[in-house]
């Protein structure tokens, strides 16, 4: 795709706003859009950039980021992996926070490592974050000093570096999947004569094992410098004070003399097409990707009105093509199960973009799938897109923008921060949602659809299958799997390019979702309910609980529940039950098959899906206030007229079969299957779905089960939470819920009392694998009548063990990259507690890790927990609890749990957290875990592992 030609064609069509002038290369010149006026933006004399914004969601919280224009592409050959290694070292000792004090300080104020405190490294950037910090003068200053130390104060002590080598090794081991290995092997071919082909961020383990500490220090001094660093602070803070503190703290950092030149490494154009096909024994499925490479937006366009207009055109075009491809998948003879079109960076590089297609071919249909997808692109290049397609894509795009705009005063910090990170790293515009909304309003109201069509048609005529064209295939390496050759794929592309095709016909159903509006039923009573909800009892027996909130001006949540679920159906139907949610959510509704329904709902932000729990029938959905009627129409159709969409069913089964056939050989799948079967003693209700099981599935039986479970909403409790008009809600409830047929009595719960295995159970098994790795899951459990206190204690036990294992297994032992525990006490069909510990580990260290896992539990049984550990848990939980009070989903879950199970999870929760004592956790371990003695351990080792 030639961006320059598209810009000029759009300019000629007057799709772009009037340009100020045309430069010597014929490019339209436009002024840069100003940064959002609510953002304090500046640059220190040393070159460091900062962004500060006051925002009160969440209240009394702030987030702190530092973005570095440095990634693995800056590494020399002998440094491969140092950018990522350096990211790790930022948590292992700095000028103001030696040792592990960054993590210790953050967790002491309720900021959890991994969840709120983290970082990532890619080819072109490294970004660090401290999220959801409780604001106080001390906390804010400390977080700014953490950012300062990341920028210019790492200690990089040799002992800490040597410890971290093992951690990096375990991260590499954990991430070494089939797709990652294929990508690493293929990058040099996908990026000929480009540094991006040799700079996968995890690096080379030979470098990680052997680099000298001084080399890492030199890399840090060379690249972590003010002109490449951006500070972002967003939250409930005083902007003037933060700006002054940034100036005070960061201004002393000196720009290095004779600083190394910062380069944007190019991705050279390729005159000949690139075809890369690779396979791996642990690749889960066959995948094809097609790329039409192009240059990124030129600097003179980036950050201007034109960037929005180009983005609008490209995204509409991609949406139209994706919709066509999705429509094709519903045909029985379609050679692919799924496909989608998008525009983004070319794989891992910022200096080259690409239009790309993602294809999941059906087994043995790879060349046919590629040919079919390419034919659709050829069809667009020959005939263009239709105006009706564009209207739908435009309406859907605009409805998403409106949803954000209507909630513009209630956006969380997490909404703003990525915008400023991208502005700093890539020059993306950030004028604010008010300006963006005006831009898109103008594009949808002032630019005729015919003109949009003309511009998009031009865009798709620019794509060559020779120059800058790439086809990349990733395949399983297994007996009987036919991997296509590059020549076969090339022939498929060439044949498609020569095809003379008919124009696409856009078949649209214009009838209403609900052709005949049902006769209204009655609301027979109204009563106050718990947590500020109101309950309407309907004439047919249904109950509707609703709570109007001001948390999110663009959100209305729906949940509906009834006793029933899978346990009401024979285990002979287990495969049909396993498929139930996917099938009934992917088929159509009423008179609309799935693709017809998608077209009908374009521009509507409303959805509604059914699901079967073990003992409950469930319906969940959401809408904007504007689309509330549509949500109710979907509810009505879910109960009264599900669609007999056999094409959608057949496509889903074909997709699942191809995925499962390949996945069954994967070590991760074997481990997951073994964990489930060991815990539940091979009970057929907890059997992992296999490809062969799909032959026993029946769409007719699934529809029959659906009719049994969702014949009417009269025995359901419906919950609506969010920003709605109560009069409208009343009207829609009377029309679409109260009108459903009544039932003689509500169903009661059927509980089969399926419990985990009792006693001490060990399952150690081996599997062939490409990268030797071990996995451990350990589950402690027992029956326990539920109390809020036990729930808090079990949660605290999991969190504190996670911190201990992080220290003993990861930091001190270098045995694992990711290790943790999660505990809880549960009400519902079974009242019980459970503690689950997970640890992907170096095979040689499995026994040592198991000993440390057991030691962590025994230490708490004998000594309890420390005051510091307890305080960290309490800080985080109380902070998290306060934040939840402003979430619609939190309140909806509360009322649903209370009505269904009789437990109030709100009243007294803060007191239960604040009153928690070390002996509570100690006694829980002694009196439940150790006394009950139910401990299930599942471990997987490589087949060729020798002690």
Each language-model region and where it sits:
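Hydrophobic, small-residue-rich alpha-helical packing segments that form membrane-like cores
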Residues: 160-228, 232-234, 239-246, 255-264, ...
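Metal-associated gating/positioning segment near the N- to mid-region
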Residues: 89-101
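Proteolytic maturation boundary segments
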Residues: 22-52, 238-312, 317-322, 326, ...
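Bacterial Sec-dependent N-terminal signal peptides
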Residues: 1-25
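M16 family metallopeptidases and their MPP-like homologs
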Residues: 51-53, 58-75, 82-83, 100-149, ...
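Active-site recognition of the HExxH zinc-binding catalytic motif
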Residues: 80-88, 92, 574-582, 795, ...
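Internal metal/ion-chelating core segments
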Residues: 210, 214-242, 683, 696-735
């Amino acid at each position: 795709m030639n961006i320059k030609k598209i810009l000029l064609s759009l300019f000629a069509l007057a799709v772009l706003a009037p340009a100020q002038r045309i430069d010597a290369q014929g490019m339209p010149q436009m002024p840069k859009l100003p940064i959002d006026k609510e953002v304090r933006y500046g640059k220190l004399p040393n070159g460091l950039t900062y962004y500060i914004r006051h925002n009160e969601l969440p209240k009394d919280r702030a987030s702190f980021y530092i973005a570095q224009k440095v990634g693995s592409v800056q590494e020399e050959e002998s440094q491969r992996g140092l950018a990522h290694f350096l990211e790790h070292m930022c948590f292992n000792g700095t000028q103001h926070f030696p040792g592990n004090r960054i993590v210790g300080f953050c967790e002491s104020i309720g900021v959890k490592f991994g969840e709120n405190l983290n970082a990532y490294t890619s080819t072109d950037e490294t970004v660090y974050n401290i999220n959801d910090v409780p604001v106080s003068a001390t906390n804010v200053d400390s977080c700014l000093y953490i950012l300062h130390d990341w920028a210019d104060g790492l200690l990089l002590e040799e002992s800490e570096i040597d410890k971290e080598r093992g951690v990096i090794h375990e991260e590499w081991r954990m991430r070494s999947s089939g797709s990652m290995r294929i990508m690493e092997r293929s990058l040099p071919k996908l990026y000929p004569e480009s540094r991006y082909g040799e700079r996968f961020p995890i690096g080379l383990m030979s470098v990680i094992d052997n680099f000298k500490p001084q080399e890492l220090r030199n890399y840090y001094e060379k690249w972590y410098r003010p002109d490449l660093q951006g500070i972002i602070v967003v939250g409930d803070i005083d902007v003037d004070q933060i700006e002054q503190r940034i100036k005070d703290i960061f201004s002393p950092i000196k720009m290095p003399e004779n600083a190394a030149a910062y380069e944007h490494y190019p991705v050279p154009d390729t005159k000949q097409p690139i075809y890369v096909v690779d396979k791996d024994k642990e690749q889960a499925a066959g995948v094809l990707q097609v790329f039409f490479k192009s240059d990124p937006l030129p600097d003179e366009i980036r950050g201007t009105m034109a960037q929005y207009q180009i983005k609008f055109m490209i995204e509409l075009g991609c949406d139209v093509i994706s919709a066509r491809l999705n429509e094709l998948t519903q045909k029985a003879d379609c050679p692919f199960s799924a496909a989608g079109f998008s525009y983004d960076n070319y794989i891992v590089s910022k200096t080259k973009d690409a239009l790309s297609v993602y294809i999941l071919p059906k087994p043995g249909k790879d060349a046919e799938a590629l040919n079919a997808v390419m034919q659709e692109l050829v069809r667009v290049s020959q005939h263009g897109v239709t105006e009706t397609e564009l209207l739908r894509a435009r309406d859907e795009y605009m409805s998403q923008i409106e949803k954000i705009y209507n909630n513009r005063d209630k956006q969380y910090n997490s909404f703003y921060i990525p915008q400023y990170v991208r502005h700093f790293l890539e020059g993306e515009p950030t004028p604010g949602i008010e300006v963006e909304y005006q831009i898109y309003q103008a594009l949808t109201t002032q630019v005729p659809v015919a003109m949009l069509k003309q511009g998009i048609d031009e865009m798709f005529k620019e794509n060559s299958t020779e120059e800058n064209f790439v086809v990349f295939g990733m395949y399983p390496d297994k007996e009987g799997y036919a991997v296509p050759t590059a020549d076969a794929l090339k022939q498929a592309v060439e044949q498609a390019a020569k095809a003379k095709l008919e124009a696409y016909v856009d078949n649209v159903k214009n009838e209403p979702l609900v052709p005949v509006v049902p006769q209204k039923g009655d609301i027979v009573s109204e009563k106050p309910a718990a947590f500020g909800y109101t309950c309407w009892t309907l004439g047919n027996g249904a109950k509707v609980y609703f709570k109007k909130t001001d948390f999110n001006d663009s959100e209305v949540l729906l949940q509906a529940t009834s006793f029933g679920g899978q346990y009401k159906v024979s285990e002979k139907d287990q495969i049909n039950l396993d498929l139930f949610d996917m099938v009934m959510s992917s088929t159509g509704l009423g008179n609309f098959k799935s693709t017809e329904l998608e077209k009908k709902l374009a521009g509507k932000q409303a959805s509604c899906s059914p699901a079967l729990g073990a003992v409950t029938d469930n319906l969940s959905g959401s809408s904007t206030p504007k689309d509330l009627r549509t949500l109710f129409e979907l509810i009505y159709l879910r109960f009264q007229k599900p669609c007999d969409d056999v094409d959608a069913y057949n496509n889903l089964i074909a997709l699942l079969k191809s995925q499962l056939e390949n996945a069954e050989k994967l070590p991760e799948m074997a481990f997951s299957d073994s964990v489930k079967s060991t815990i539940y003693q091979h009970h057929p209700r907890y059997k992992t779905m296999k490809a062969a099981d799909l032959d026993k599935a029946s769409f007719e039986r699934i529809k029959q089960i659906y009719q049994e479970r969702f014949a009417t909403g009269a025995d359901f409790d419906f919950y609506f939470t969010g920003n709605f008009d109560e009069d409208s809600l009343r009207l829609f409830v009377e029309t679409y819920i109260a009108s459903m047929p009544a039932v003689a009595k509500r169903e009661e719960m059927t509980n089969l009392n399926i419990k985990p295995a009792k006693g001490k159970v060990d399952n150690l098994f081996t599997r062939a694998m490409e990268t030797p790795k071990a996995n451990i899951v350990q589950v402690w459990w027992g029956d326990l009548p539920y109390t809020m206190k036990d729930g808090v204690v079990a949660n605290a036990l999991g969190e504190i063990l996670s911190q201990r294992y992080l220290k003993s297994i990861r930091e001190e032992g270098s045995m694992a990259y990711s290790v943790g525990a999660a505990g809880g006490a549960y009400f519902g069909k079974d009242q019980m507690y459970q503690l689950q510990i997970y640890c992907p580990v170096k095979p040689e260290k499995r026994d040592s890790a198991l000993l440390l896992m057991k030691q962590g539990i025994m230490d708490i049984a004998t000594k309890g927990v420390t005051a510091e550990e307890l305080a960290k848990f309490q800080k985080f939980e109380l902070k998290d609890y306060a934040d939840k009070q402003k979430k619609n989903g939190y309140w909806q879950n509360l009322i649903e749990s209370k009505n269904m199970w009789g437990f109030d999870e709100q009243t007294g929760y803060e007191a239960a957290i604040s009153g928690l004592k070390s002996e509570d956790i100690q006694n829980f371990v002694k009196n439940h875990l150790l006394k009950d003695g139910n401990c299930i351990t599942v471990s997987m080792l490589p087949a060729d592992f020798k002690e």
